[in-house]
Amino acid sequence: VSDYLCDMSTTDHISADRLIRTWVACGLTHAVVSPGSRNAPLVLALASHPSLEIVVALDERSAAHVALGMGLQSGRPAVVVSTSGTAAVNHGPAIAEAFYQEVPLISVTADRPSEKRDWGLGQSAMQNGLFEAHTRWSCEVPEHQNDMNTLDEIARTAWRKSQRGPVHINLSLDEPLYGKSKIEVPVLA
């Protein structure tokens, strides 16, 4: 008997995968992630690159400060990834510090699709433009942005602009958040 089951080791989100691939090609070596569901496609995309040093930090504020330290030490941006809602807001203190010290940093916040925002749902907050006062550049990537040229340009612009301080990308991700793979499901006798 065959069935389709969720494969939690892959992502079908082209946007998450393409942004990470482009940053790795630009020279990304460090990333910091915090546990969450909405950011799973980003975490899976990062994990698919064995050359990356990935640090897991349970607290988003701490995660952003670890990424800030990586940028200070290496002189290159580290990527810090958070799930949606108030978790994303916790990147703020490190982003402000990176802004004033001109430390390279890329903050990527996962978000609900635009049509599922502002409904009073859990883990929802206005994330687009959240850090505009303290970033060199910010961008909202819509949930169905799959044009490779556009995604490459967003990633390259973020990388370039982050050389003199933090940038913020708010990436809308719809469900399912994990990839789908066809696998064999054994029949129990």
Role assignments for model-derived ranges:
Residues 5-189:
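N-terminal alpha/beta PP-like core and its mobile active-site loop of ThDP/TPP-dependent enzymes
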